[in-house]
């Protein structure tokens, strides 16, 4: 310490205990001050290792090339990739921007749902009833590159099944977006979305 005292830290030490469990829970963080994109890498790892499904809830969808490719590749190899988005946005600019990614994702087999009762603020990935992430990390540049974020990775715990059940309950209140829906969007929304995409890395 600054007073040059020697302190006994023993009372603050945690005793480690072995548990007989097949799974684990790992809290983690992501910061913009290093070169490691922890938040994005965890999401991409889940997409790349999924066998049956990856179900996602996110309030924003502003993707870089790596994440867009991972979503498309997972769907193209037969994984059920489903994304729940808000039906009513909090920020129209981000909402219109998100919709510019819909045609590419839908063409690759990604399923997109919009929560018709209102806004979705959850940031959730759940895959194959074995892995899940819940935290603060949105699917946008701000969360993935510019902000301090945190999340929890769950592997083979009972909570993973509960997260999937919540996803299914939420999806039951959603409208599944079709390519026809995308084509029939108002012209001004399409224009605003494409213009906003020019500054997507700032959002």
Indicate residue ranges for each PLM-predicted region.
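Charged, low-complexity intrinsically disordered terminal segments
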Residues: 1-203
